[in-house]
Amino acid sequence: MTNLKYIAILIFALVLPMGIGSAQPNPEVSQDVRNVAVQKILEGRSGVVAVYARGLCCPSCAIGVRRMVSALDFVDTEKPEKGVVIDPVNQLVTVEVKAGKTVDPKAIRKAIQDAGYAPVHIYTVVAKKLVTQSIE
């Protein structure tokens, strides 16, 4: 019985460190990395904006962001993921805009804040150039 107890403790001691940190959120990426990601997301697409939401680094925590942003009247909820795609690696929220509607940066800022995150920038592409606007 004593040997069995030692074996169980040894197995527990070896397996426990493997699970530590497995549910860690993604670390903050640099603005340069985020700009490249935004350019890839928005390239060749119209009616789409991206928002940098500081702290948005866990996919399950971001569910509230999708719920809050998709409730905005200019979001095309007929698109996949209710028109709101979450990228926790780059801390980006991509929003599909309904045809004929315009984006309201103040409404996006409030929706993301209400979900518990800090919106920093809104990105669009105009004439193949990335345009960044502060929404803090």
What is the meaning of each model-derived region?
Residues V65-D87:
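Short acidic amphipathic segments
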Residues L56-R67:
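Conserved redox-active cysteine motifs that mediate thiol-disulfide chemistry
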Residues A8-G19:
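Bacterial N-terminal signal peptides
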Residues G116-K129:
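Conserved short beta-strand edge segments in small beta-sheet-based binding/regulatory domains
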Residues V65, K106-D114:
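Short amphipathic alpha-helices in soluble, non-transmembrane regions
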Residues E43-G55:
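Short glycine-/aliphatic-rich beta-strand segments at the starts of folded cytosolic domains
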Residues K129-E136:
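Short, low-order "capping/linker" segments at domain edges
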Residues M1-A8:
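Bacterial N-terminal signal peptides that target proteins for export
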